[in-house]
Each structure stands twice: as structure tokens, then as C-alpha cells.
Amino acid sequence: MEEGVVGGGGAAVLVALLVTVVLAVMRSAGSRSSKRGRLPPSPMALPIIGHLHLIRPPPHRAFDRILARHGPLVYLRLGPSTHCVVIGSADVARDFLKFEASIPERPPTAVTRQLAYGKAGFAFAPYGAYWRFVKRLCMSELLGPRTVELLRPVRAAELADVLRAAQSAAERGEGVDMSHELVRMANNSIMRMVASALPGEMAEAARDCAKQVAELVGAFNAEDFVAVCRGWDLQGIGRRTNEVHARFDALLETIIEAKEEARRRSLRLGRRESSSKDLLDMLMDAAEDDTAEVKLTRDNIKAFVLDIFTAGSDTTATTVEWMLAELVNHPECMAKLRGELDAVVGRSRLVGEQDVARLPYLQAVLKETLRLRPPAVFAQRVTVEPVQVRGYTIPTDTQVFFNIFSIGRDATYWDQPLHFRPDRFLPDGAGATVDPKGQHPQLMPFGSGRRACPGMGLAMQAVPAFLAALVQCFDWAPPPSQPLPLDMEEAAGLVSARKHPLLLLPTPRIQPLPSFYS
């Protein structure tokens, strides 16, 4: 009897203590909430993991589902302490971009810290003197109009290899893996623009490294969201990152040493001319400039080359592949583009980058593909101070995801947003004045503002020309075993590529191919 009384008293004390703790936690949470202000709508979170269980790959699709249910601005907690907001409409994106000074940087991850030599590169460099210097270097020299034009023959030569591969496949009556051919073309083009005298075996090694870099950067890594996982490498991502970084670093060191020797030899012979410079030459010139406001280090050069190679090659190949796949699925659009090419360019010569400005339907196909199938499906920033937007307070150190995939399908701006309709971008279409270079939030495949992709000028010139040549020279159809429409499922990763290889049968339209490419 006495034991029952004592036990009952102990239970009462325990309950009282638990109630006190719960009330204290609630008061503390309320106090923190009042300090940080009102947050955007949010799905129900789980203890510890927050909303991680909702982010199934590919993440842009998961974000899109959440946005469809909770509105165009959503708060998520990924893990115990990683706070995020996701933007899914052009209007909300426009409101956020008014506070660009408050979201100037990209949040680094465990993988990018290692691969990008800390923050030595351009993509993840903090906003400041170094970032501004490299941005100017990019826009005026490395990826400026003069350099893009100067390196046009490099891109033309790589396109020639793709056309020859398609011609050979057609002669054998076989299909061609366009996914493989386009990745090879884009990677080789970028690497030869970076270092013109690159041996074939180095290009192959660089291509393999770039593929693994894209996989690692795009992979979910628990260490980025759950602090107790840091240092344990439970997924093996850290080990793989170290291995890829070591391989890429050794490759870059070999390329740089070869370039240094070539520059010394040219200088001795008096052959050093600006017209023959590639991007690596330009970076080395900047590093050797004693009057420059920022001194580039060897790690800066390596990180920058890595940025250009990984960002430029996969996105180029992916965009051309999506364009070609959409045209195969929409024969009426393919016929319209082919008619434009025949009328403007003809069949006596190959269409080139210089023709793009005179081909409005080609430009419309590119814009519609970038709207519906953006290769970079979200842009990521982090707040450096609280941001007041739409009645909500976004706290400092909150990751901001512009879900470009959802924004491009915003029904407020686009009629039938899930349909492939290039005509919307023709002069009499609703999107005639919409430009994809970041001025119109409803179409921002290259991001917007100071962190927009510096290579957009190159992309807008080279990508449509690649596609135009393929359409001008060949008819394309899937193998008999693969009926239309083509499967358009996306793969998870840093770049939103097609999940399955694009296998097509080419039939020559121009025989022989134009002499410049024969």
C-alpha cells in the first residue's frame, strides 16, 4: 500500500517535470519564432530530419510537388538546423531578387569545398573583391564576345565529328547514341577552348572526371544537413570526392605545366600572339599581371578551369539533347524548323553560329526547351541578413532555392505550360519579348542577377547552331523497337539530363555533307 502511494507520488512528480520541460521548450520556440518573424507556409516536419523525407530525387520534382500543395513560397527544414525557402513562381522570384544584396552567395557543400579548392573558384567564391575581379575577367575576356568568336573554329571542329559519326551510322544502317556523341562533343569543345593543345587521352580522362564531379555535386550528402554525420562519411561520398579531386588535380597540373612550357617556348621564339590564346593563356596572363587588383594563384586557375568545364559541358550537351528529343516527339515542329533552315540557309553550306540571329524559329525552339527542360533546374543562394518579403521574415543563413523548373511552368505567365510550343516565342507570340538572360523571372534558365551564369552568351550562340546542323543534315527517328513518343523521364543529378540514352536513326538530307565538314 505504501509502495503504491510512493510510486504514485513519484509519477506525479515526473509528470510535473515533463510538463514544465515541454512548456519551457514551447516558450523558447515561441520566443525564437517571434524574434525571427513569420515564416512562409510549410509541410508538417518530422523530428530531427525535418522535411528531408519529402525530398525524393530528383529534388526539383520534389520541390515542385511541395509548391503545388503549399503555394509559390515554402519554408523547409532539411535536417535539424538547415533552414530553406523554395521559390516556385516568377512573381515571388522577382520580389526576392529585389533583395539581391541580401542573398549574394551560393552555399558551399562538403563536396564543393573539396572540389573547388575551398572557395578558390568562381562559382562558390564569396562576394567581394576577388569575386568582382573574376566576374569582370569572365565577362570581358574569358567568355566575352571576342573570345567566343575567336574560339568558334574549335566548336565547329567538334561538331564536324558528330556529323561524321551520324553519317557513318547512316551508311551502316545503324542507330547512333546521341547522348554519348553530344556529351563528347561538348566536353571536347570546352576542354579545347580551355587548353587548345590537349591530347586525346587527356580529354577522355577529363570527361570521365567531369562526369563524376557532376554526380558528386548533385548527390544528396547527409553531412550537409545532419551535423552528427560529419566526419563519418557514411555514404562514401567523401572518399569518392577525395579520389576524384586527386585525379582532376593531377590532370590539371599536367595541363598547366604543359601550357607553361609552351608559353616559355613561344616566348623564346617570339611567337606569342594574342590571336592564338585559349582560356588558360588568359588566366595565366591575369596571374602574371603585377598591376592586377587581385593576384590569381595556381589554385584559383585550377578551380576556375574546373568551374568552366563542369558547368559548360554537361549543360550544353543536355540542352541540345532535350531540343532534339522534343523535335522528334513533335514532327510538326521539326518540319517547321527544317523549312526555316532550307529557306534561310539552303543546302549548299552548313548552318553556323553566324546564322542564328536570322532564324527566329530556331531561337524559339531553344527558348521553349530552356523553359520546359532547363538543364540547371534550380539556382541556390543563402541569406547574409534577414529578408522581409511578402509579409514573411526570412532569417539569416537560410538557403534560398529558386526552383527554375517550376518557375518556367508557371501558369500565370504561360498558356498550357506543360506543352512544348515554340510558337509562343515567335514575334506574334505571348513570349515574344521574353529574354532568357535573366531580365524576365518567368524564364531564367541561366539564373539572374550578379550570380547569373557568365557563359550564357556562349550558350545562346553555340547551342542552337549545334542543333540546327543536326536538323539540316539529317532526318531523325527512333528505332522501330522504340515507338513515339520518346521517354522524357529525367535523371537525378547536378544537371537535369534525360534518364535514358537518346538512340536515333539518322537519314542524310544532304549528300555529301557540306565540304567544310567532309
Swiss-Prot record:
Swiss-Prot/TrEMBL cofactor(s): heme
UniProt binding sites for heme: 453
Any GO molecular function: flavanone 2-hydroxylase activity
Residues passing through the membrane, by range: 5-25
One protein family per Pfam: p450
Entry superkingdom: Eukaryota
UniProt cross-references to InterPro entries, sorted A to Z: Cyt_P450, Cyt_P450_CS, Cyt_P450_E_grp-I, Cyt_P450_sf
Chief location category: membrane
Keyword Aminoacyl-tRNA synthetase among record annotations: no
Similarity comment text for this entry: Belongs to the cytochrome P450 family.
Stated role: Functions as a flavanone 2-hydroxylase that catalyzes the direct conversion of flavanones to 2-hydroxyflavanones. In vitro, can convert naringenin and eriodictyol to the corresponding 2-hydroxyflavanones. Generates 2-hydroxyflavanone substrates for C-glycosylflavone biosynthesis by the glycosyltransferase CGT.
Protein name: Cytochrome P450 93G2
Gene that encodes it: CYP93G2
